[in-house]
Regions:
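Glycine/aspartate-rich loop-and-adjacent alpha/beta segment that forms the canonical ThDP
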Residues: 104-116
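Nucleotide phosphate-binding/pyrophosphate-handling subdomain across enzymes
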Residues: 2-48
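Short glycine-/acidic-enriched loop or helix-start segments at secondary-structure transitions
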Residues: 9, 36-38, 61-62, 110-113
Length: 116
């Protein structure tokens, strides 16, 4: 699951906790008709975030998402598109780190279209 809603977030948070790595880098964006606060509540606080938005009219601004996330003690920077967020996460990640891309399925679609 990409964690686009609370039930998906509950499942994914268990999966992320099980991953053995030095540090987690999370490229994250959402659309405006989802429970943003509820999903953010489920994300790990010990990760670095790369807040972004998909190329979709329903996408929440990366800057607004960052502000919401800061109220949940999630720290990171904002990026105007998925490619720049993903590139920054890859550059910052070491060999024993883990990079996750999700939040909205549109974010994953942009990753597949533009980065892989």
């Amino acid at each position: 699951d990409t964690e686009h809603n609370v039930p998906g977030g509950e499942y994914l948070s268990k999966q992320l906790k099980a991953i053995k790595c030095n540090h987690m880098h999370i490229v994250f964006g959402m659309v405006d008709d989802k429970d943003i606060q509820g999903v953010l509540d489920l994300l790990p606080q010990n990760a670095t975030y790369y807040f972004t938005k998909a190329n979709n009219k329903r996408a929440v601004s990366e800057n607004v998402l960052k502000l919401y996330a800061q109220t949940k003690n999630l720290q990171g920077e904002s990026y105007p598109d998925v490619k720049s967020a993903y590139d920054a996460a890859k550059k910052a990640a070491d060999n024993n780190d883990f990079v996750f891309v999700g939040g909205s399925s549109y974010v994953v679609a942009d990753l597949l279209k533009n980065c892989i």
